[in-house]
Amino acid sequence: MLRSRNRALSLGRQSQGRLDVPLMLITAALTVIGLIAVANATIDPYAVSEGTGIFSVLSRLTSNSFYWQLAWVGVGLVAIVLIQIFDYRVYGELAVYIFGVALALLVLVLFQTAGRGNVTAWFSWMGGSRSFQPSEVCKIAIILTLAKHISRYDGPIVKLKQFLPVLVHFAIPFGLVLAQDDVGTALVFLAIFLGMLFVSGLGWKIIAGLGITGATACVVIWPFLSEFRQDRVLNFLNPSRDTSGTGYQVRYSKIAVGSGQLTGKGLFQEGAISQLDFVPEKHTDFIFSVTAESVGFVGCLLIIVLYLALVLRLFYLSYKMQDRFGALIIAGVASMFLFHIFENIGMTIGLMPVTGIPLPFMSYGGSNMLANLAAVGLVLNVVRHQQKTVL
């Protein structure tokens, strides 16, 4: 074990290439757009402005959300730099300890008395005015440790004795997140797991078993879901079922998106439906709706193109990796982003059930911003330490 760790530590001095510029540019663009979106969602367009330009916007903000988001971007950038200190294979050697810390955080948060609704997924600080969601950063830990576990197998996972330990590895943190009643984040964990399995390769018997088990689990779990969770699924299947109750969010979200039309009503402008607080959680879960109303179809198309470029770039990098461990890390990050993007945008326009997961780089939330930037930092580390140049 000591010899393997010394070997991993020496890797940091070998085959260090350049950071992936396309990935960095895409991430930077989405982060800047996200900061603008948070400011747009938290402004009072009717307030008297002080100054001109950006100072006019800042003087009309209704909360400190923009400043906190900016601060978390700074923390995330520091995380990217710190992640580059060691070769990613060093982190792989520490996978057992990283997994242990992640599980400890997921267990400790269950004992928090304060939560949001029935969800106990946050550590509160600063007298409860600020919070931190450990499951967000635990996504990175799960990606790293699962990649290390799966990479021990030279080829596709075709035997049950190979698959079961990997399944248990995933099931423990997945179950702890479900115990927090955070179904959205649990589904992200599931997407990461399935994405990494797909890239690693699976035998057809295991694929069939997963399909049957998944379908059976949905039937078995349904009666045990809270009425609120069931309503969200039923409202998705029948949008007109309860438009003034649990379907209220999606109803006004779709109205806001549609009212943006081709070019939008403009950023920081009066007369927006979302600015009148008809859209709940407008700077977090439903920030895409607010942004769509402001920038219209054209602006939304640009944002979606950037997200598509992000995911495609990640899967391309995963494909080009010579190292199986590195390829699986990038595949896990790509799967995480893909599910977040598809689910969040889908729920704002009624194509997916509402789960409450944020839109990467855009939704307000420090824990998620830190996790997103740390994930990008990990990918940059993998690419930088590959001997073969990735175009």
Feature map (PLM): residue ranges:
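Hydrophobic, glycine- and aromatic-enriched re-entrant/interface helices and adjoining loop segments
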Residues: 116-131, 208-302, 322-326
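Hydrophobic alpha-helical transmembrane segments
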Residues: 70-79, 293-312
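Hydrophobic residues within the alpha-helical transmembrane core of Major Facilitator Superfamily
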Residues: 107, 139, 171, 194-195, ...
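Membrane-helix boundary/helix-loop-helix interface segments in multi-pass membrane proteins
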Residues: 2-30, 36-181, 345-360, 364, ...
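Hydrophobic transmembrane alpha-helices of multi-pass, membrane-embedded glycosylation machinery
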Residues: 186-197, 212-215, 308, 376-377
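Helix-loop-helix junctions and helix-breaking kinks within/between transmembrane helices
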Residues: 41, 167-196, 226-230, 292-299
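Small-residue-rich helix-loop
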Residues: 256, 313-320
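Loop-to-helix entry and N-terminal half of a specific, functionally important transmembrane alpha helix
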Residues: 317-355
